[in-house]
Amino acid sequence: MHKLIEKANTLMEALPYIRRFSGKTIVIKYGGHAMADEALKKSFAMDVILLKYIGINPVIVHGGGPQINETLKRYGIVSEFVKGMRVTDAATMGVVEMVLTGQVNKEVVGYINQHGGRAVGLSGKDGGLLLCRKLLQEVKKDDGTIEKVDIGFVGDITDVDSTILVTLEAGGFIPVIAPVGVGAGGESYNINADLVAGKVAAALKAEKLILLTDVPGVKDQEGHLLSSIALADVPALIDNGTITGGMIPKVTCCTDALTGGVHKAHIVDGRVEHAILLEIFTNVGIGTEILG
């Protein structure tokens, strides 16, 4: 009986959040270990389906770096990187687009639909969703000057046309977006999935942006999790070394989304089963929230 009461209390704890977020959009970046582990894939799918059933509109943006690396290796294509960004020539871009849109996207869509959802896969090329220009990577030279390096078909988003997403949401579907955009000449561009999630969230004026990662969240210099960060405090946390390395672009993506009209951004450990539900529907939450 005690366990049953605990379950009832959990449902009651979720009630005000269900009421608050019903009818709202939540953009979720899906990547990392959560895409590789079978139990986590199932819990992700069930979380997303539950959101839709209770009136919340989830929009998914997925990554696919490990799958791209594996396929490039199979084709004998060796990648170069500039400041962590893959140099993407035409041959590499062909593989990237094939893997993201033809393999990973369909797997994510299939898993959600297999468990009772109604997901639809698309890329940034569909409906003119993500318009891009070539991203020139800035590299600091030995003399201290900054050089802009052409890294191929890597895109910087210039415009988001969310019409197709709004249409899918209204029809009861869950959009699943592969991070491939289109240039003015119709050429394909590989885009950082975190960047796509942030830009899409801003375009939709989403209630929340959630980034699923392979870390618990942002930690202070003693290694303790920071459960909440104010937008105004982010520059100082970067300057003093609290936010470092690969966490900087993720936090920057969140801050850009907040300044674009998103209400809250969250960096959450995707290795935790039902991480999405725990963040949205519990008083304590998990991970780090960034507040505008």
Swiss-Prot record:
PANTHER family: N-ACETYLGLUTAMATE SYNTHASE, N-ACETYLGLUTAMATE SYNTHASE, MITOCHONDRIAL. Disulfide bonds: none annotated. GO terms for biological process: arginine biosynthetic process via ornithine; L-arginine biosynthetic process. Catalyzes the ATP-dependent phosphorylation of N-acetyl-L-glutamate. One of its GO terms (molecular function) is acetylglutamate kinase activity. This is Acetylglutamate kinase. It catalyses: N-acetyl-L-glutamate + ATP = N-acetyl-L-glutamyl 5-phosphate + ADP. It comes from Geotalea uraniireducens (strain Rf4) (Geobacter uraniireducens). Its main location: cytoplasm.
